[in-house]
């Protein structure tokens, strides 16, 4: 059992590394979006809300509509959150979009991609850990007592059902915590972006400030992801063992 726990721990560390890479990629993409759009809404006196609220026109609108189509295609391929997909589709159908809306939608898209990847990777990890621990427990019981010899391996769909049932006292599952982390980052970026525009900061200063906030948000998200992966991996392993004992009627 100790070897299995060590294997689960290594898998959790590997999953965290993949999540960390996805968040880093989102940070670079967000930095690019920030630089592009803050330069566009700049005047001689700095960035302004008046410029930010101007409608996209002609080539600028065509460019963003094409970008939205790419976001939608990626969402369809990666099973994005349905509410976000609806927002993208609604925006794609609109005749008028402001520069600020375009900027925020792009930032939110990259957040959705990164946290969506975190959700998938975490779910895959927990599914594998549950199946491995459940199967190993059944094997050990059968080897020692003969009980459970006919117990088959648990399938992926059955594990998904288990993962949708909260084990923590606050009633949240791993996905709830991931989307909460994403919402916190998006809310903070919105607040800081609005502040930079309202103060009329110089473009370079605003870009520097916003990329700092993105980096802070990613650092926080990484910390939460690391803690989540390790905590959930340990809990799901224990739950698999408990459920196997229960299924076999073993005390």
Per-region residue spans from a language model:
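N-terminal leader/targeting and assembly helices and adjacent pre-domain segments
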Residues: 1-216
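Acidic, glycine-rich two-metal-ion catalytic cores of nucleic acid-processing enzymes
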Residues: 207, 220-251
């Amino acid at each position: 059992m100790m070897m299995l726990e060590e294997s689960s721990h290594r898998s959790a560390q590997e999953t965290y590394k993949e999540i960390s890479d996805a968040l880093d990629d989102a940070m670079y993409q967000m930095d690019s979006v920030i630089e592009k759009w803050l330069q566009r809404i700049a005047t001689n006196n700095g960035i302004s809300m008046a410029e930010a609220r101007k409608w996209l026109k002609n080539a600028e609108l065509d460019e963003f509509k094409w970008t939205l189509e790419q976001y939608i295609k990626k969402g369809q391929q990666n099973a994005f959150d349905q509410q976000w997909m609806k927002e993208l589709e609604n925006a794609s159908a609109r005749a008028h979009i402001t520069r600020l809306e375009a900027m925020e939608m792009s930032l939110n898209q990259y957040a959705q991609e990164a946290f969506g990847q975190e959700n998938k990777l975490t779910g895959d990890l927990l599914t594998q850990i549950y199946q491995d621990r459940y199967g190993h427990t059944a094997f050990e019981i059968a080897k020692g007592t003969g009980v459970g010899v006919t117990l088959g391996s648990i399938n992926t769909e059955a594990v998904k059902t288990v993962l949708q049932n909260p084990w923590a006292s606050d009633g949240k599952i791993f996905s709830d915590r991931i989307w909460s982390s994403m919402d916190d980052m998006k809310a903070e970026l919105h607040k800081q972006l609005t502040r930079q525009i309202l103060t009329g900061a110089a473009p370079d200063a605003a870009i520097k400030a916003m990329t700092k906030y993105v980096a802070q948000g990613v650092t926080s998200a990484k910390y939460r992801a690391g803690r989540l992966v390790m905590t959930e991996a340990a809990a799901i392993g224990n739950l698999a063992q408990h459920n196997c004992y229960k299924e076999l009627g073993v005390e």
